[in-house]
Curated annotation (Swiss-Prot):
Name of the protein: Crossover junction endonuclease MUS81
One cellular component (GO) term of this entry: nucleus
Gene (UniProt): MUS81
Cofactor(s) demanded: Mg(2+)
Biased composition (Basic residues): 115-124
Cited function: Interacts with EME1 to form a DNA structure-specific endonuclease with substrate preference for branched DNA structures with a 5'-end at the branch nick. Typical substrates include 3'-flap structures, D-loops, replication forks and nicked Holliday junctions. May be required in mitosis for the processing of stalled or collapsed replication fork intermediates. May be required in meiosis for the repair of meiosis-specific double strand breaks subsequent to single-end invasion (SEI).
Originating organism: Debaryomyces hansenii (strain ATCC 36239 / CBS 767 / BCRC 21394 / JCM 1990 / NBRC 0083 / IGC 2968)
Domain ERCC4: 361-458
EC numbers for this chain: 3.1.22.-
């Protein structure tokens, strides 16, 4: 039997044309590849008589080569030719002559040892991950093995996970802890049934693994049935080992971000030593997960003595405090009249609410949202933790606590306030000056306890803050040491929720243990924020150092009216804010300018009256000349001097 022609190139060209036409009719992308291969085969200068040569042609791959080999086989059968061996081996999925030769050479070698198969490692989800939480939720919640819905699993799994079970695309969090359900199903640990409303249940392997996880952690039951309670406090936080909250907090404490050196400093309500605070400040540089307590010792009910209070303050502060105390003791107290029968002190009426007449409610600012599509996240999650809360617009702060009278419905503001910041928002506030202004407004509220809560962002966003890392560390250090705020840094929004829930219970139990009476101020009119703060300070000085536990508080409506950003502001405060609107004018510079020019009118007259004879170029340098002897951040440079002139000198 004769073989086909020696050069098969003309046959391959014909078959490639045919394949290209068919692919074009079908509208497939293969038409492009066949046309490219056709052009390359046409231009190939040498004969093509074996698969190796055919594959060496550009744009001719394995699939094209097999296609042409099959066409050659049909051609040979039709014309009664013998198919070349090399092409026959390619069609049958065999190996070429060279490979066959290699195989035959190795056939005489002794049998090689069979390769030991690696045993597949059992999948075990990481502790406090989404998969870990889902397994435990199904183990505790699906005793009848009938399955749980997604919502039921999330409700039960949340206490076991460090990550939220809801994604938040607005914060670049596209995956949630619930994404782990796919891994559990892939490894046959969890199965599901149904379509529209799926039910999930543990397989036998999943049940055994969940039981092992439960035994390893020593869980007896799901914490979802136990609420935050059984706390024991004196004048500091102390959680009993067998309390239900202790079991929940152990899970939170298992992550580094929730660890503190002792429970007394967890909420900043108990006294802490200066040395321990310094330790935490030093830890700031080495640990990105910062849990801190304020520098100044805090006392929950009784006011500290002047000597112990002064021991943590600079010398100048101590001297000024001493003078102020002397002034109060000698002059102020002498003219402050207290009529206990009519409940009037220094012309201000007050009421007394005894324990049992009021309930404590957590109030969240309505601008505190998780995302535009999930605006009720805080209220929903806190309510699921049995925390009574409400959402309203707040004049200052993001979270406060109020006491509501059970009969009259009147509310008073308690001495606790929180400012919550995502790390990206903190960076923005540092850049535009809001950071310092917001802390000053918090201070004017006259509260005892200030909490500054910082939430981390996803890892991909952390790279954006590389050049701001030093500024972030400095800002947080100043918040603790200078502002005396209790700063807490969290890994996720779920940790913030857990902290607020537990702190609410701490406040309630503190009131119950001390049998605290609320002394409610009924001020008729308050002119500004300074008067608001001074009035509450006078009442605290009078009533909160007695054997009977009192807490002085303004009405919530008074707090809202007095603490508004624009309302109740003095000319000085308004002028400083106007100056800070100029890019580059920090709070320190704005205060320095206001001290030199008391009102906006004085600054305008400085340019238009006192120095009206100067040229425009000289006027632009005036502010730089006026503040050339200032120290540090109060000094004004050439560029900033020109900016101030452009705003105030060209009115």
């Amino acid at each position: 039997m004769e073989g086909p022609p020696g050069d098969l190139k003309h046959l391959f060209i014909e078959w490639l044309q045919e394949a290209a036409i068919n692919a074009t009719k079908k509208g497939t992308k293969a038409a492009i590849l066949y046309n490219k291969a056709l052009g390359s085969v046409r231009n190939y200068p040498l004969p093509i008589n074996d698969p190796k040569t055919l594959k060496s042609v550009q744009f001719v791959g394995d699939k094209t080569c097999i296609h042409l080999s099959k066409k050659l086989e049909e051609y040979c059968k039709l014309n009664n030719f013998e198919l070349p061996v090399a092409f026959g081996g390619l069609i049958n999925g065999g190996v070429g002559e060279k490979r066959k030769h290699e195989v035959s050479d190795t056939s005489n070698l002794p049998d090689a040892k069979p390769k030991k198969q690696r045993k597949q490692k059992q999948y075990i989800p990481r502790k406090r991950s989404g998969g870990y939480a889902i397994l435990l939720a199904l183990y505790f919640g699906d005793k009848k093995k009938t399955g749980l819905t997604k919502e039921e699993i999330i409700q039960r799994a949340t206490p076991y996970s460090d990550k939220s079970f809801k994604s938040n695309p607005s914060a670049n969090e596209f995956y949630s802890a619930w994404s782990s359900i796919k891994s559990l199903q892939t490894h046959d640990l969890v199965d599901s049934s149904g379509r529209s409303s799926k039910s999930y249940f543990l397989t036998e392997e999943g049940y055994e693994l969940a039981k092992q996880l439960k035994d390893a952690e020593g869980f007896e039951s799901s914490p979802i049935t136990n609420h935050i309670a059984d706390l024991s406090f004196d004048n500091q936080v102390r959680v009993t080992p067998d309390s239900s909250y202790s079991k929940i907090s152990q899970q939170l404490d298992s992550s580094p971000l929730m660890k503190t050196k002792n429970n007394k400093d967890r909420y900043g309500l108990g006294p802490s030593r200066l040395s321990s605070t310094r330790e935490r400040i030093l830890d700031l540089s080495s640990s990105p997960r910062l849990i801190s307590s304020p520098l100044k010792p805090k006392d929950f009910v009784l006011r500290e003595s002047l000597s112990s209070h002064n021991s943590t303050r600079p010398l100048q502060d101590r001297e000024s405090i001493s003078k102020a105390e002397d002034g109060i003791n000698t002059k102020t107290k002498a003219r402050l009249v207290h009529d206990a029968s009519k409940r009037i002190y220094d012309g201000t009426n007050y009421d007394i609410w005894v324990p049992g007449e009021f309930e404590i409610i957590l109030i969240i600012d309505n601008r505190e949202i998780r995302s535009q599509r999930d605006r009720d996240f805080f209220q929903t999650r806190l309510t699921s933790l049995k925390v009574e809360c409400d959402v309203r617009p707040l004049s200052v702060g993001d979270v406060v606590w109020t006491a509501k009278h059970k009969k009259t419905g009147r509310e008073v503001i308690l001495n606790y306030i929180c400012e919550r910041k995502r790390l990206d928002d903190l960076v923005s506030s540092i850049k535009d000056g809001r950071f310092q202004e917001q802390k000053n407004r918090l201070k004017k509220s006259g509260m005892k306890q200030f909490y500054y809560l910082v939430e981390d962002v996803v890892t991909s966003d952390m790279n954006k803050f590389g050049d701001m890392s030093d500024a972030i560390q400095t800002a947080m250090s100043m918040t603790m040491t200078i502002s005396n705020f209790y700063l807490k840094r969290f890994k996720s929004i779920e940790d913030t929720i857990a902290f607020l829930a537990s702190l609410t219970q701490v406040i309630k139990d503190q009131f119950a243990k001390n049998k605290t009476n609320l002394l409610v101020l009924k001020a008729r009119s308050i002119k500004n924020q300074a008067e608001y703060s001074s009035l509450i300070a006078k009442f605290k000085e009078k009533f909160e150092n007695r054997s009977t536990s009192y807490e002085c508080a303004h009405l919530f409506s008074t707090f809202q009216d007095s603490m508004g950003k624009t309302g109740m502001m003095t000319v000085k405060e308004t002028f400083i804010l106007m100056l800070m609107g100029i890019r580059g004018v920090s709070l320190e510079r704005a205060v320095a300018i206001q001290n030199r020019f008391k009102t906006p009118k004085n600054l305008i007259e400085f340019f238009f009256v006192e120095n009206n004879h100067l040229s425009e170029l000289d006027k632009k340098q005036l502010m730089m000349d006026v503040f050339k002897n200032e120290i540090g951040n109060k000094k004004i440079g050439k560029v900033l001097s020109e900016k101030i002139y452009d705003v105030w000198g060209c009115v």
